[in-house]
Amino acid sequence: MSNQKVESLEALISKISYEIVSEGILEETEINKLLGVLANNGVYAMWVWARSRKDINDHALFNELMRVMKFVKEKSEEESFENYFQSISEDLHKLLFIKQLLEKTLIYARYHAKSLGD
């Protein structure tokens, strides 16, 4: 991976994390809970937990997060999020990289939420 690709990925993570907070998709407490589920139980569990929450617009959230995750694996238009998350679990390297990307995005979002006073 070239330095330019890494820099653009970092810039994208920063932008998406800000948008998650500024567009009201997640508040700081929701971000902290998602980070906890992601860290302790993994990517698929985070997706299932977000879907189970009535106070989280999971479709808006995962459309934003997909902008980062597509660097590892694209999601086709007809593919459901459930199938996408199950398919990435078949490749451990991709799964761990996506987990790192999601953690970084949510950590940045948490800092944005703190700075905006959410």
Where are these regions (language model features)?
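Small/polar/charged residue-enriched interaction surfaces, especially the RNA/DNA-contacting tracks
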Residues: M1-D118
